[in-house]
Amino acid sequence: MAPSAIPEPPPTQSSTLPSHADEYAVQAGVPNFQGYDHITWWVGNAKQAASYYNTLFGFRTVAYQGLETGSRYFTSYVVANGGIRFVFTSPIRSHAHLPADEPISDKDSALLKEMHAHLERHGDAVKDVAFEVDDVDAVYNRAIEQRASVAVQPPRTIQGDKAHGDVRTAVIQTYGDTTHTLISRRGYSGPFLPGFVAKSSPPSSLALPPINLVSIDHCVGNQSWDEMVAACDFYEQCLSFHRFWSVDDKTICTEFSALNSIVMSSANAVVKMPINEPAPGKKKSQIEEFVIFNSGPGVQHVALLTDDIVATVTAMRARGVDFISVPATYYEAMRRRLGSEKRRWELARDFETLERLSILIDYDEGGYLLQLFTKPLMDRPTVFVEIIERHDFEGFGAGNFKSLFEAIEREQAERGNL
């Protein structure tokens, strides 16, 4: 079972927007973040969720924990593609219907109850975003020194067998019901974590096109009204992150809706966590829709980095992934911009192919990115996936936010949620 937690809400902070970048300055002498280790989803059926990501997104099953490994109340499947690991965990017993003499530990009982409550409130959703760090104890201790309320699981060593070694973990609370596991693998060589066994995807006769992903690029959290700064304060105070990038409702708006966004980054810039909140508009924004159907703040989307977005999106479309639609007017305007603005790079992908695949382009003078977003992956209009390719450009698609918002607003209107 991947480390998880019973959450406590973070204390209320000021909702005043920071006025300068140095309000979240880079801090020296802090433990290093190595990157995203894995993302844990709590879902109703872990086996089906793993199969879904394997089939549509080209992941493969690499590890398992369940009844056969001695886990009597939870099942987890770990799927991977490149440096990306998703863990899908489900309860396999009803907490409300356990017999009085059920030999369940207090810890498992509390976790089983929490997991069912999480599923009822959020549906299938991201529960934990795990960071690999070089010193679990130092990161955890700083976090709880700043805010004792974020403590979920103190540092502990998960013992493996002699052949594979052990890992050190801790868990802290972030926005909503979301947690961060801090993990140091210390040379651990097992398939995922101690307690998991290696498992492969069942053989298939389908000839599906391969998908090669690289890593998690960023992970976006949506907040309710006036909660963005409080969430960013947590990352600055507890994890020594700094403000990497920000935009406000004057930049990210359409005729109907708007948002504010701040990207928080680890000191070494290997982990970036954009934080969004709604801003006033004529109608309901995508951020408001998310918060309503997620029943509170949570992870809105996970961006997956690829070296070849054309091949990746082509393969995903062939496998059945449903992406947002981008109107032809976007590409007409983009073609004019690319033809008239000065820049030090040339587009490495065929423009007509990008248009055919509805891939978005954002850039500055020194580089560019290509990106595309799936439609929500669940019946609730909550979590989705972004596919992104970068070329000397560390932005987050601000130039596409208006087009993206308009595309999502069309989907919202179809759902009756605009």
Functional labels for PLM-detected ranges:
Residues P3-K47, V126-F131, S189-C232, S295-L305, ...:
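N-terminal beta-strand motif that seeds the catalytic metal site of vicinal oxygen chelate
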